[in-house]
Amino acid sequence: MQPMTRNSRNSPGSRFPGAFAPEPDMDEPKSKSQKKRDMTALQALGAELEALAKDRLARVPMPEALADAIHEARRTTSHEGKRRQMQFVGKVMRGLEDDEVEAIRAALEGFKGTSKAETARMHLIERWRELLLADDAALTRFLAEHPGTDVQTVRNIIRSARREKELGKPPRYFRELFQAIKAALDEKDSAAGEQPPTPEPEA
């Protein structure tokens, strides 16, 4: 039988494979295509930051260097100047730690959730306005769900909104009705701490 040497123990055919073999490197370098995808994603993230409203941008956790780059991009008005500055924003973002990038992503996702809720609420108000203008019975239901509403005020606004529409006047009371409905929903939410149900027309 051939004696086992150090080299033979390391060979693929050894009875004890890997006895002296080095640990495989699990942290393999990223491919060029993966790097390109990562760069594109960070560039898009930077564009989202640049487009944020000022108050929301102030609430996003980010390093000072990135905040400065974003603010400079927002101040830049020329197309070419903004393009170059946004490239710089992307460069700064590529230097961030993974946890910093994730914190930014989490903040942006939170804003998207808030925006969806705000949009849904606006649609709810518009739906109530549509029902109230179309059917007097809808007011009874609205008052039942929002008992704190000033009945006479809302009724007068509805009548005025209908009249101005018939006469082709500017939609002053149409807008006032929106605000009255919004105020009633806000009051209910403050009292109950829950989102009001979406109204559906009675069968």
UniProtKB/Swiss-Prot annotation:
Q: Which keywords does the record carry?
A: Cytoplasm, Ribosome biogenesis, RNA-binding, rRNA-binding
**Which Pfam families does the entry mention?**
DarP
> What's the superkingdom here?
Bacteria
Name its cellular compartments: Cytoplasm
The residue ranges flagged as biased composition, category Basic and acidic residues, are: 27-39
Where are the bilayer-spanning segments? none
The Gene Ontology biological process annotation of the record reads: assembly of large subunit precursor of preribosome
- GO cellular component term of the entry, any: cytosol
Give the compositionally biased regions (Polar residues): 1-13
Could you confirm whether the keyword Nucleotide-binding appears in this record? no
Region annotated Disordered sits at 1-39
Per UniProt, what is one GO molecular function of this protein?
Answer: ribosome binding
Q: Which family does it belong to?
A: Belongs to the DarP family.
Q: What does this protein do?
A: Member of a network of 50S ribosomal subunit biogenesis factors which assembles along the 30S-50S interface, preventing incorrect 23S rRNA structures from forming. Promotes peptidyl transferase center (PTC) maturation.
**PANTHER family per UniProt:** UPF0307 PROTEIN YJGA
What NCBIfam families does its record include? PRK05255.1-1 (NF003593)
Q: What is this protein called?
A: Dual-action ribosomal maturation protein DarP
State the species of origin: Cupriavidus pinatubonensis (strain JMP 134 / LMG 1197)
Q: What is the lineage of its organism?
A: Bacteria, Pseudomonadati, Pseudomonadota, Betaproteobacteria, Burkholderiales
